[in-house]
């Protein structure tokens, strides 16, 4: 794995919804049995090459649950990911409590404005 950090959005970048599905796309996400998310035909072949060269950091608006539904090709699941607009850092699929506490502290004084 390389020393370069490759930060990437997921939806409509690396992963596409069923609404944008192409005939050769590969399903990598299901919800209640229904196909939800897809990689392009090339993505499963290219991801191993990417993760050998760089640290892949997905950054997404997805919730933890939505992110964890993604079935990454063998050996390509990112060790870290930012979910919930960066509020939650996952390390090997587990919430980084220190990151979460720091995120909450940043918005503490602005909750009223954010809720409006």
PLM segments and residue spans:
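Active-site phosphate-binding/coordination module
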Residues: 39-116
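Generic structural motif recognizing short loop/turn segments at the entrances and edges of beta-strands
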Residues: 1-2, 86
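Active-site neighborhood of HAD-like aspartate-dependent phosphohydrolases
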Residues: 2-6, 10-58
């Amino acid at each position: 794995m390389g020393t370069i950090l490759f930060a990437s959005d997921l939806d409509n970048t690396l992963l596409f919804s069923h609404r944008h599905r192409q005939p050769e796309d590969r399903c990598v996400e299901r919800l209640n049995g229904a196909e939800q998310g897809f990689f392009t035909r090339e993505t499963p072949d290219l991801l191993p090459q990417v993760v050998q060269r760089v640290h892949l950091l997905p950054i997404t608006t997805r919730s933890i649950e939505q992110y964890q539904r993604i079935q990454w090709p063998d050996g390509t699941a990112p060790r870290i990911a930012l979910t919930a607009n960066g509020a939650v850092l996952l390390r090997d699929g587990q919430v980084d409590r220190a990151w979460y506490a720091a995120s909450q502290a940043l918005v503490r004084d602005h909750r009223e404005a954010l809720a409006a």
